[in-house]
Curated annotation (Swiss-Prot):
Family in the record: Belongs to the tetrahydrofolate dehydrogenase/cyclohydrolase family.
Protein's GO biological process: L-histidine biosynthetic process; methionine biosynthetic process; purine nucleotide biosynthetic process; tetrahydrofolate interconversion
EC number of the protein: 1.5.1.5, 3.5.4.9
An annotated GO cellular component: cytosol
Gene: folD
Organism the protein comes from: Campylobacter concisus (strain 13826)
Catalytic activity: (6R)-5,10-methylene-5,6,7,8-tetrahydrofolate + NADP(+) = (6R)-5,10-methenyltetrahydrofolate + NADPH; (6R)-5,10-methenyltetrahydrofolate + H2O = (6R)-10-formyltetrahydrofolate + H(+)
Keywords on record: Amino-acid biosynthesis, Histidine biosynthesis, Hydrolase, Methionine biosynthesis, Multifunctional enzyme, NADP, One-carbon metabolism, Oxidoreductase, Purine biosynthesis
Keyword Amino-acid biosynthesis: yes
Protein name: Bifunctional protein FolD
GO terms assigned for molecular function: methenyltetrahydrofolate cyclohydrolase activity; methylenetetrahydrofolate dehydrogenase (NADP+) activity
Keyword Hydrolase: yes
Residues at which NADP(+) binds: 163-165, 188, 229
Length: 283
């Protein structure tokens, strides 16, 4: 059993980001990410600070817009419009979740697809489904980067994705399909989940339920990727996979923490660099 070390892979990606950011600056372009945070959600504030810190460390300028909880949808859309038109901004990220009075789909649709570094705009979703180049959500993209870094050939594998969210499950399935895996997506209504998982060469768990994937659901030699991040009552951070039970059966497995988590921000930085490079190419 080998550990898939997402922290190490993320550092490699971020070092590459820094090199390319320095190259862009030679052309007079400072790669810039605008981060929009609405409200006082503690987890969101933590994520935004982590994104700002990573940007500053690896050569990307971050511009934060912190808006109050009672910001109206129209006020938020007006800000996004300003950022869309600002040539110095290459990437726009609206931190989710948004307050309940704001329609997330309307807000995401307002972002210029060329600046949609989170990969949530319908144009980029459509490109992913069609196998075309576009921005891809950072977490599933990070999973693919880990698999690539460890030389795990996805083509021809039976892959099971547990979870069908727009942020992880669906894009993960499409990335694996585009890489020629045979993909099954499972969810809360799936029957015979245990049997389906037992046939999988590769399992990606992304449902947000601690210790959901047990050893009796995994065949010997499978690759298991744990996207879950769950905080237990005792303060421990654990994944969707019962690591101690499942790991001995795996050929490769990601830990939590230190697996997929660090890749999300690394791929966000990478997407921001791609947006800045595309801008130069266009000009």
């Amino acid at each position: 059993m080998k550990i898939l070390d997402g922290k190490a892979v993320s550092l490699k990606v971020k070092e590459s980001v820094k090199v390319r950011a320095d190259e862009l600056k030679k052309f007079g372009v400072e790669p810039t990410l605008a981060v929009v945070l609405v409200g006082e959600d503690k987890a969101s504030q933590t994520y935004v600070r982590a994104k700002e810190k990573a940007c500053n460390e690896y050569g990307i300028k971050s511009v934060a817009h912190r808006l109050s909880e009672n910001t109206t949808q129209n006020e938020l859309l007006a800000l996004i419009n300003v950022l869309n038109l600002d040539d110095s901004i290459h990437g726009i990220l609206v931190q989710l979740p948004l307050p309940k009075h704001i329609d997330t789909n309307v807000v995401l649709a307002a972002i210029d697809p060329r600046k949609d570094v989170d990969g949530f705009h319908a144009v980029n979703v459509g490109k992913l489904v069609s196998g075309l180049d576009g921005f891809v959500p950072c977490t599933p993209l990070g999973v693919m980067e880990i698999l690539k870094e460890y030389g795990i050939e996805v083509a021809g594998l039976n892959a099971v994705v547990i979870g069908r969210s727009n942020i992880v499950g669906k894009p993960m399935a499409n990335l694996l399909l585009n890489a020629s895996a045979t993909v099954t997506v499972t969810h809360s209504k799936t029957k015979n989940l245990k049997e389906i998982c037992k046939n999988a060469d590769l399992i990606v768990a992304a449902i947000g339920k601690p210790f959901f994937l047990k050893a009796d659901m995994v065949k010997d030699g499978a690759v298991v990727v744990d996207v879950g991040i769950n905080r237990l009552d005792d303060g421990r951070l654990v994944g969707d996979v019962d690591f101690d039970e499942v790991a001995p059966k795996c050929s490769y497995i990601t830990p939590v923490p230190g697996g997929v988590g660090p890749m999300t921000i690394a791929m966000l930085l990478n997407n921001t660099i791609l947006a800045a490079q595309a801008k130069i190419a266009k000009n």
